[in-house]
């Protein structure tokens, strides 16, 4: 068997006909600047070829359902293994997917609860046990010898009526006695019951004395009693004045509730047999949220304090104003009073109505005036009714602005039916178990005690569950719960979950290709991840990891540096070998940083800010423990902490959502906190995340940054355009006139292929240029509009050197390291890091007010350390303009250059949510309680930066 994967002539995207040899059964890290060609080699070449070869091994019938894969642009790849890609782009957004379902642990839990779960009555909570005839007989026969037992069949339990038919049937059946409400009656006499009272009626089947020779008779009596009552047997022991009720069913005999045979599907919230009927197994419902109807309680009704559709009371002649005037008159309040200062009962009436109480409404319209008397249904009730009744998508969308996901009123977020939630193992139902963090779940399973029979049944199930939970713990996800929605996971978390699943499968001889598995992981947990990767390698697999993390690079068996630059300046193998060999390579930027020859310097002086601060009081969203924290304004603040410590809850849920509501007037429900002070010192908040800059190929860097407007205006000002009467609109590919109508300005035509994936082919009319012939005849400096869109930022900067407005925008794109990106490159082809840097460039090109707060969540994702240096420069420029920059980050290069650190923890999940430290990086490095401080201390001392320093 080959000991290397040999790639010859790889030319995919920007790769320059490169040859690479990758050792098998090794941990191989590919690194290089953003856009250098790492993903082109790892995913678009190696993985794509592995997938294509697997597809070719299938039958043509199977292939028609899977679609056809193009051969990558490569001469040959030898020594390939079956390839599995674990990237960050395949995170499930389905609200039904949870950590438990994605890892398949929930399937084992469903089996466990179905096989050894103890059912209880969902109404009274009494344990329900089902017993066979033999088990019932054995229990009765175990009573002391010579004990007299009366076997009864409970045919009526707590039901009103005279029940004469029951007595008649018993007589016809040959039975002599019945017990009614505790008293024995002979069936030969007339029994009269009060039909308005509840009664208990039991037929006396037999009277038995406990002796070994009476077992046959006892068995017959139990079988008859069970048949008469539908599975119930009552053993009355007069001498002991006690009764024992036995049941062959899962049913509560007190409440009359029965449960069917327990099966795994009953515990699935994706099955109609188990899902809560109210929410359909989602655990949440979309409901009108009063906080979104009244986003600013400091405003009055007359000031537009109520923003819901149809209920703005600013206009005098509106119907809503007619109701408000009537309410104010009846309940004696002033419409000019801030809504938050109105009495509680008045706010309740505004939201939920007057019930049956009528209002006196005075109307005055073009058709006449008069008085009406009618109840007021309330704004919340009105909006919910309109949402249910409307046929208009626009109205539905408008009303959804006032709605929020709330826990289901019946299952309270547990997703399952009440009878399913009443089944417990070790005292917990399946929902309560999955709501525990993984560490607590493991502890629960370790102390779980089962009967000998149940332990035998559960042994193999528990072994599988434990091993999978341990794998999740080994990749640093011990703070997650199995009930956590997969849609709320970060890219790094979802990737590590799939990594844990792969370890659990114990495959060998596989080629795994991973995309930055360290994203979102604190340095403390990095060693766990590396141990996991080594374990996967030691099983006999080859790992190709696209990664920028220095710890991972140093742990690699083989390191491949792609570059030297990005885009057209990349696509070559700069250096390949052990980490030590790459560190000695003068040409490798990665090597320069590994050796310590290049470093991101620590600032000589920290900014102190403008004297003002944002003060968050009593933040308690998710795992935050009523934290109070100050964020100084005019500085760069880094929020740090181990994974799951509460960073995103504090910054994204509490701070961002509160400020975006107050400053940008967005309708969002902020995370729980007592209040935020200091908002008056800011004028806007901007979240610069890694979401795409557009959802369609029509969106591109030129359109997003506003650059294209200036370019179109420039083309419209040329002599050719003026002679033809062309305006700037002529050079838009989004509107009729200048665009190619054959493809509507897309440049591509979509061919639907039924079973096969849709195929995009260049438009035959415009040859992919998007514009019609007449528009392309207009030139500026010898280039038409399509040729300009095909330029890289770097080429365009030289081309538009004499156009200051365009040049300045292009320069900001160069400053953020996007010189290799084409102006017209579809936004759908840009990585998350590239999209984020385009947003940063757009902000840099705007005139600063010095009162903006920028929020960034792990902006170093996908960035090489050289790109991180450039990012830090941009963040410094934004801060130096007087703005405030707030960054959630694990990258020590960013943390060490921050002016202020807020460290959360100490652990993740329930053990987190507290402020461990606030202050400068130097003070943080001296804080022994801070995990971040421990690693920051090494970074500031320079130990971590240069283990391969060449003397």
Regions inferred by a protein language model and the residue ranges of each:
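Conserved phosphate-binding elements of NTP-dependent enzyme cores
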Residues: 1-951
């Amino acid at each position: 068997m080959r000991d290397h994967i040999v790639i010859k002539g790889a030319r995919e995207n920007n790769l320059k006909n490169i040859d690479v040899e990758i050792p098998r059964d090794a941990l191989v890290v590919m690194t290089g600047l953003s856009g250098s060609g790492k993903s082109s080699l790892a995913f678009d070449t190696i993985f794509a070829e592995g997938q294509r070869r697997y597809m070719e091994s299938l039958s043509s019938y199977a292939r028609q359902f899977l679609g056809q894969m193009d051969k990558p642009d490569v001469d040959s790849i030898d020594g390939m293994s079956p390839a599995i890609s674990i990237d960050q782009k395949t995170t499930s957004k389905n609200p039904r997917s949870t950590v438990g379902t994605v890892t398949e642990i929930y399937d084992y839990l469903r089996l466990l609860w179905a096989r050894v779960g103890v059912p209880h009555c969902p109404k009274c909570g009494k344990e329900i046990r089902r017993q066979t005839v033999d088990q019932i007989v054995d229990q009765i026969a175990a009573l002391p010898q010579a004990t007299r037992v009366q076997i009864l069949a409970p045919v009526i339990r707590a039901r009103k009526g005279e029940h004469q038919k029951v007595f008649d049937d018993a007589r016809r059946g040959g039975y002599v006695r019945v017990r009614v409400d505790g008293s024995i009656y002979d069936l030969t006499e007339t029994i009269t019951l009060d039909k308005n009272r509840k009664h208990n009626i039991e037929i006396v089947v037999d009277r038995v004395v406990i002796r070994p020779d009476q077992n046959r008779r006892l068995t017959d009596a139990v079988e008859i009693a069970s048949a008469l009552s539908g599975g119930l047997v009552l053993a009355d022991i007069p001498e002991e004045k006690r009764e024992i009720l036995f049941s062959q069913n899962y049913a509560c005999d007190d409440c009359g509730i029965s449960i069917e045979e327990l099966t795994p599907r009953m515990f699935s919230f994706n099955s109609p047999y188990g899902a809560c009927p109210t929410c359909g197994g989602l655990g949440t419902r979309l409901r009108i949220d009063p906080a979104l109807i009244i986003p600013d309680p400091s405003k009055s009704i007359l000031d537009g304090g109520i923003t819901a559709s149809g209920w703005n009371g600013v206009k005098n002649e509106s119907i809503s104003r007619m109701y408000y005037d009537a309410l104010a008159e009846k309940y004696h309040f002033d419409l000019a009073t801030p809504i938050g200062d109105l009495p509680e009962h008045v706010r309740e009436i505004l939201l939920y109505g007057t019930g049956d109480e009528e209002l006196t409404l005075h109307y005055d319209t073009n058709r006449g005036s008069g008085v009406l008397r009618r109840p007021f249904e309330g704004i919340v009730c009105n909006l919910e009714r309109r949402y249910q009744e409307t046929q208009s998508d626009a109205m539905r969308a408008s009303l959804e602005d006032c709605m929020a996901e709330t826990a289901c009123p019946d299952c309270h977020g547990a997703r399952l039916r009440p009878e399913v939630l009443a089944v417990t193992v070790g005292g917990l139902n399946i929902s309560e178990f999955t709501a525990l963090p993984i560490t607590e779940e493991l502890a629960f399973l370790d102390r779980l005690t089962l009967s000998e029979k149940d332990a035998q049944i559960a042994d193999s199930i528990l072994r599988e569950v434990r091993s999978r939970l341990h794998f999740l713990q080994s990749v640093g996800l011990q703070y997650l719960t199995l009930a956590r929605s997969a849609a709320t996971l970060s890219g790094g978390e979802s990737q590590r979950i799939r990594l844990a699943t792969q370890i659990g499968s114990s495959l060998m001889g596989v080629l795994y290709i991973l995309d930055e598995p360290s994203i979102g992981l604190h340095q403390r947990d990095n060693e766990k991840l590396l141990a996991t990767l080594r374990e996967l390698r030691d099983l006999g697999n080859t790992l190709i990891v696209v990664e920028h993390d220095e710890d991972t690079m140093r742990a690699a068996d083989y390191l491949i540096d792609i570059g030297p630059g990005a885009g057209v300046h990349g696509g070559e193998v700069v250096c390949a070998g052990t980490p030590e060999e790459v560190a000695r390579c003068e040409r490798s930027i990665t090597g320069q940083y590994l050796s310590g020859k290049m470093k991101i310097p620590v600032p000589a002086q920290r900014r102190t800010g403008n004297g003002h601060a944002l003060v968050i009081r009593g933040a308690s969203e998710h795992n935050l423990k009523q934290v109070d924290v100050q964020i100084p304004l005019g500085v760069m603040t880094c929020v740090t902490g181990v994974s799951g410590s509460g960073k995103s809850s504090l910054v994204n849920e509490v701070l961002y959502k509160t400020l975006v509501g107050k400053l940008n007037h967005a309708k969002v429900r902020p995370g729980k906190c007592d209040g935020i002070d200091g908002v008056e010192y800011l004028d806007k908040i901007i979240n610069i995340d890694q979401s795409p800059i557009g959802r369609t190929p029509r969106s591109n860097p030129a359109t997003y940054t506003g650059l294209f407007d200036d370019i179109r205006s420039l083309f419209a000002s040329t002599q050719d355009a003026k002679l033809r009467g062309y305006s700037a609109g002529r050079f838009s590919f989004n509107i009729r006139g200048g665009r190619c109508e054959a493809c509507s300005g897309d440049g591509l035509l979509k061919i639907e292929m039924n079973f096969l994936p849709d195929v995009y082919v260049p438009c035959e009319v415009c040859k992919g240029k998007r514009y019609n012939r007449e528009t392309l005849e207009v030139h500026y400096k010898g280039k038409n509009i399509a040729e300009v869109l095909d330029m890289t930022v770097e080429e365009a900067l030289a081309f538009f050197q004499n156009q200051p407005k365009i040049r300045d925008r292009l320069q900001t794109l160069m400053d953020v390291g996007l010189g290799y990106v084409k102006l017209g490159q579809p936004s759908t082809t840009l990585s998350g890091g590239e999209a984020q840097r385009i947003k940063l460039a757009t902000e840099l090109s705007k005139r600063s007010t010095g009162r903006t707060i920028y929020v960034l969540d792990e902006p170093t994702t996908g960035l090489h350390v050289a790109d991180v240096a450039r990012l830090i420069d941009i963040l410094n420029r934004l801060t130096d303009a007087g703005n405030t920059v707030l960054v959630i980050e694990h990258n020590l290069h960013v943390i060490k250059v921050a002016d202020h650190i807020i460290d959360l923890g100490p652990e993740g999940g329930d053990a987190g949510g507290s402020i461990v430290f606030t202050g400068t990086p130097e003070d943080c490095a001296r804080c022994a309680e801070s995990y971040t401080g421990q690693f920051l201390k090494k970074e500031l001392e320079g130990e971590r930066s240069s283990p391969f320093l060449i003397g």
